[in-house]
């Protein structure tokens, strides 16, 4: 029997979705990036045939996301800002090869300290972010934790006291234009006293309040010549009349609405369950619904109708940010050290123009890997294994070659040898779901059911839509009866 801790990890990242969600992503040519600070994950939501693939990456309390059309991505975490860059040339090399159309690699990690970072956005002069703990909008530079650029007139000083719970940010023409806050208070945590109806939507350039009396507003957005806001305490999506401040509800949803992005007539909205705690007690949503949902809901903004949803189960209970990746359908995001970070180089265009690559042959180790792939696809497993071994003798840190050698050895029923190589793969790349699944296959054939179950469950945790691993786990459980 597995321990209770191990069995508890079997289902934490499961999700269900409407059948039209994958087709909708395919038709729009998009994927989604979702942050869940409560679960400590960034989720890539990708269509995979007729299924939806939710691909999880681990970061410490990820919240704000900022993505632009040049391939830059920034993620705010508990005390850092991670900056990534899409490196398209790496994407075809990521396992399974030929499936990915984008690969985001880290370029910079900036230490902010614990500032409770909320929404972020790229602007004309770099990255802007909401510093909720110090109640201000900030930019960054290399010498400072953060550079305060704006605070509301009702906040009298910079202090790590979360005086008004500034949270949402929208840019217009490359500069901050709209923000949301949960109160207009100037004392430590003062917004909590009237959280149900103390929220405001503000104009940044004028520092004027556009709309007041809102219930925990988040995520202001300017889209389609209209100002949108999520009135989270109501669980609603609404438009705002900029001249009068009137709120016009468009849709009410079964959760705490926070995080939104648009594509065409569709809004992709994050929903959170919200805990029964002092923070969320007494808001309209908890009075309207005894049970709330966590996931991504898709709303037609013209009709207000819900057209699709992705619902997270078990451990994922709160969503912060939702971003659409336009023109990218199957992205990868690396946050851990791996061979791609060691061997991928991004250069300025001026330098790239002087890089000579046309006559550079494959290295001997790369040629061995290439020969191994050819032999494998031709069904010559022993020959493929020889090529992979030769390449690993030259370059022992080729994890792709070691993984392929491991699965060949499992196919050849050389269980112990396969386990030896696959364990090295997961030691280097702990998120390699396919390697964990192959380890499970090897262990089940060695009658080591405990280890087999652990690796199948680990593969499913890493990729909840990994049907092969689920089927293998079902077989194992049947054998254990």
Question: In which residue ranges do the predicted regions lie?
Answer:
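Short, charge-rich amphipathic alpha-helical segments embedded
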Residues: 390-408
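Sequence-structural signature of mature extracellular/luminal beta-sheet repeat domains
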Residues: 2-366, 370, 379, 413, ...
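Alpha-helical protein-protein interaction scaffolds
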Residues: 434, 438-441
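Helix-start (N-cap) detector for alpha-helical repeat units in TPR-like alpha-solenoids
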Residues: 365, 399-400, 415, 433-434, ...
């Amino acid at each position: 029997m597995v321990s209770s801790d191990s069995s508890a990890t079997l289902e934490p990242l499961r999700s269900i979705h409407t059948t039209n969600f994958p087709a909708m992503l395919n038709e729009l040519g998009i994927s989604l990036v979702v942050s869940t600070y409560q679960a400590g994950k960034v989720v890539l939501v990708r269509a995979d045939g007729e299924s939806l693939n939710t691909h999880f990456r681990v970061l410490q309390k990820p919240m704000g996301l900022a993505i632009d059309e040049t391939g830059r991505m920034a993620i705010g975490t508990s005390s850092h800002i991670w900056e990534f860059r899409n490196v398209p040339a790496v994407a075809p090399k990521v396992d399974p090869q030929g499936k990915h159309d984008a690969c985001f690699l880290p370029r910079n990690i900036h230490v902010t300290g614990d500032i409770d970072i909320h929404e972020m956005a790229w602007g004309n002069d770099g990255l802007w972010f909401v510093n909720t703990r110090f109640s201000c909008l900030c930019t960054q530079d290399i010498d400072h934790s953060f550079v305060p650029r704006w605070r509301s007139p009702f906040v009298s000083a910079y202090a790590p006291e979360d005086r008004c719970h500034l949270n949402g940010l929208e840019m217009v023409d490359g500069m901050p234009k709209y923000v949301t806050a949960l109160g207009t208070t100037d004392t430590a945590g003062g917004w909590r006293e009237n959280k149900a109806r103390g929220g405001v939507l503000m104009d940044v350039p004028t520092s004027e309040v556009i709309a007041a009396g809102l219930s925990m507003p988040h995520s202001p957005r300017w889209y389609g010549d209209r100002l949108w806001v999520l009135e989270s305490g109501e669980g609603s999506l609404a438009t705002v009349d900029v001249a009068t401040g009137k709120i016009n509800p468009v849709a009410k949803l079964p959760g705490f609405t926070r995080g939104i992005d648009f594509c065409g007539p569709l809004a992709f909205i994050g929903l959170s369950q919200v805990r029964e705690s002092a923070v969320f007690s007494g808001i309209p949503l908890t009075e309207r619904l005894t049970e709330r949902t966590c996931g991504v809901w898709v709303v037609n903004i013209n009709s207000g109708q819900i057209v699709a949803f992705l619902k997270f189960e078990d451990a994922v209970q709160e969503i912060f940010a939702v971003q659409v990746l336009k023109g990218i359908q199957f992205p990868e995001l690396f946050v851990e050290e791996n061979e791609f970070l060691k061997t991928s180089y991004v250069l300025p265009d001026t330098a790239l123009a002087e890089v000579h690559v046309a006559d550079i042959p494959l290295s001997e180790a790369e040629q061995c890997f290439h020969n191994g792939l050819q032999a494998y696809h031709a069904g010559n497993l022993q020959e493929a294994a020889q090529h992979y071994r030769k390449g690993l003798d030259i370059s022992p840190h080729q994890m792709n070659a070691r993984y392929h050698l491991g699965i060949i050895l499992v196919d050849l029923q050389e269980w112990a040898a396969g386990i030896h190589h696959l364990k090295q793969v997961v030691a280097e790349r702990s998120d390699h779901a396919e390697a964990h699944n192959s380890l499970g296959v090897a262990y089940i054939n060695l009658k080591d059911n405990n280890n087999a179950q652990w690796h199948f469950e680990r593969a499913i945790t890493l990729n909840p839509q990994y049907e092969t691993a689920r089927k293998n786990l079902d077989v194992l459980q049947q054998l254990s009866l």
